[in-house]
């Protein structure tokens, strides 16, 4: 409303509409300047011609390229944020002063990201001169608001104090966390403010993990000191320190000893994003406070927090050092608790000043995952229910101490604790965690390439001896389909490439050895020719094939081919009835006269399974490099000629004994002879066979043995002594139950999954197979 309108004049001055039109045109070019110039005119009611000329000159100056540009503020005020106008860094801003809103000018609240939903608004404010959000002050402010209400005078003062601590440069903490902790480390001193407020600084109740070592060494504190005394006593040398080492400044971003990154150099709108980015890099690089001597923690392993971990374990090798630092956690529990009491330095560094060693020695052990001070955690996490008073610790410790004392009184003859040196005298052998063999030995030992040509020739000869012409033709077609691919990939390889190929195979096999030993699944690894290169003990238990026989270190005397006689006859008659070794063609009765070489995969499967395997191998060898095949098969049990003869003698004797008189004793004697020959040829457990022989040689004992004795004696013996006995699938357990699988027809029905791993030349290098019996 113009001045002429207020005075009652019927027509406005001619300059007023001109200025209004000019102002409306300039608002599109610079809405901020137009609104700022228009607001005083509307409030004061100035409508003179001089006012219109002033607006015209201001609009003209807005287009001046030499006019200084206004910088954008880091955070706009609430009024400017709602009006989408440019604000300033000062509070109150100039626009709010012009509009008379200087009392209500405060920073606007931005929309939080999803990962910041639990962060308070103060934490998202940008820091000025290394002054970041103070969790201690914020917690006290929230407590005051809950007690006095949001509009009380005390809360207004607290909010002003928080803002002053946040923005004032004088509130920056000059406390050097790293050097102060290092200087107090040898003296056993604790910064006073760490112990003053346990609810604000719960870092005292945090157990550090192997990924970050503590900043304070409390090894000089006695381990049996109560929590109350440990928290109330503060050293006199640190009484003049009033700053909180972790509270006033969130952390010192310029100090390389904490996180090795500078938050000020990162272009983030808030410190949460910078902290997340910096901590990810800190965790990925492994560059923390962990000493270089602790190689186990640098690998990111999770150690177990127990009372035997001492401060001297990290780099100090004295006689009082725990011998099992990151070994078996069971061995850590066997260390005597008195050892840490006699040595003042042998305190639990993972318990720090919480209970002075009591929690680590008396209470159950726990796994420490991460234990940076709680000030570095999300502010929302400190508000969760936790033990914030020392009365809870005192009560728990008192109950546990009384219970422990009662146990000692009721059991005066309690054996002494087992010490680690005592374990050595008792002959306790600690398992080797890592092999002594180095991968470098593989590159030094391999001098010649592996002859795959002779391996394929031996495979072809074995297939022709064992399978019928029709089945041999099916296998030959499958191998012929991938023969051109083998020729194309190997024709450009020279001698050095072939040697390198064998080194790659041995190096990969070296990695699979740990996998096979750690995995409880029957597993074998073979070359592309089908020759067995590695085998697990579970596979030997399942099939009866010894590892030395499969790897070619002992002669292969197996005569069980599983397909020469009609299906279901239950016989072990081989195709070569004279017991010829399928590898060398020599007689197997000679007891090891044949040539030793690795067993082919085709010798472990029945006829149908072998044909199916090579058909799938032809599709997967040069097909999907990450593909796998999952199907069923039948594994052949390891049976020698003596085993087959003993089985036939036992069955004939039992059949004759059932027809004539007194046949029971003859059957028992024949079964005893069969048992003796079988145990000699297989080299099985001598104690179990001896027990079976003693039971069978008694003429009075003509009744069939129980299922447990038959399982202990082996599957072959159970078949001889009780041919009509059936094994329940639920009764299979342990090694004895695995041995009795396939005792009838010499075949173990399994489900197996296998895949092909290629080398650097994209040639099939090895085949990894996992078996599970169908029970």
From Swiss-Prot:
Residues 657-668 have a biased composition (Gly residues). It is found in: Nucleus. Residues 1-70, 179-248, 286-351, 556-592, 649-725 are annotated as: Disordered. The keyword Acetylation does not apply. CDD domains: GAL4. One of its GO terms (molecular function) is RNA polymerase II transcription regulatory region sequence-specific DNA binding. It holds the Pfam family PAS_13. The keyword DNA damage does not apply. GO terms for cellular component: nucleus. Residues 77-105 bind DNA. PROSITE patterns: ZN2_CY6_FUNGAL_2 (PS50048). It comes from the Eukaryota. InterPro entries: ERT1_acuK_gluconeogen_tf, PAS_13, Zn2-C6_fun-type_DNA-bd_sf, Zn2Cys6_DnaBD. Keywords: Activator, DNA-binding, Gluconeogenesis, Metal-binding, Nucleus, Transcription, Transcription regulation, Zinc. Transcription factor which regulates nonfermentable carbon utilization. Activator of gluconeogenetic genes. Residues 21-41, 48-60, 195-217, 230-244, 292-323, 334-351, 557-576 have a biased composition (Polar residues). GO terms for biological process: cellular response to starvation; gluconeogenesis. Residues 218-229, 669-713 have a biased composition (Low complexity). This is Transcription activator of gluconeogenesis HCBG_00867. Belongs to the ERT1/acuK family.
